Amino acid sequence: MFVKTGDKVKVIAGSEKGKEGTVLSVNVKENRVVVKGVNMIKKATKASASNANGGVVETEGSIHASNVKVIAKAESNKD
């Protein structure tokens, strides 16, 4: 896959078009990436030992890899 964890990317298609962020994770099997600060979704969580109150948590959702363009490679990925 052309994008790796840690790369800085720009979203080139979809509702988040124009946003930039760092790749947090890559799912090679489904050809999807999770970009920091892009495609934020709200998820309801139950109360637990680590989260006493529970409630709504905002987290990044995945987007298809074809919707992003690499701006800068991560330092460890420069080949």
From Swiss-Prot:
User: What CDD domains has UniProt attached to this entry?
Assistant: KOW_RPL26
Q: Please give the superkingdom of this protein's source.
A: Bacteria
Biological process terms from the Gene Ontology for this record are:
translation
Q: Which SUPFAM superfamilies match?
A: Translation proteins SH3-like domain
This protein's GO cellular component annotations are: ribonucleoprotein complex; ribosome
One protein family per Pfam? ribosomal_L24
GO MF entries? rRNA binding; structural constituent of ribosome
Which key words tag this protein in UniProt?
Ribonucleoprotein, Ribosomal protein, RNA-binding, rRNA-binding
Family affiliation? Belongs to the universal ribosomal protein uL24 family.
What HAMAP family does the database record attribute to this sequence?
Ribosomal_uL24_B
User: What quaternary arrangement does the UniProt entry report?
Assistant: Part of the 50S ribosomal subunit.
Q: What does this protein do?
A: One of two assembly initiator proteins, it binds directly to the 5'-end of the 23S rRNA, where it nucleates assembly of the 50S subunit.
UniProt cross-references to PANTHER family, sorted A to Z:
MITOCHONDRIAL RIBOSOMAL PROTEIN L24
Q: What is this protein called?
A: Large ribosomal subunit protein uL24
- Origin organism is Lactobacillus delbrueckii subsp. bulgaricus (strain ATCC 11842 / DSM 20081 / BCRC 10696 / JCM 1002 / NBRC 13953 / NCIMB 11778 / NCTC 12712 / WDCM 00102 / Lb 14)
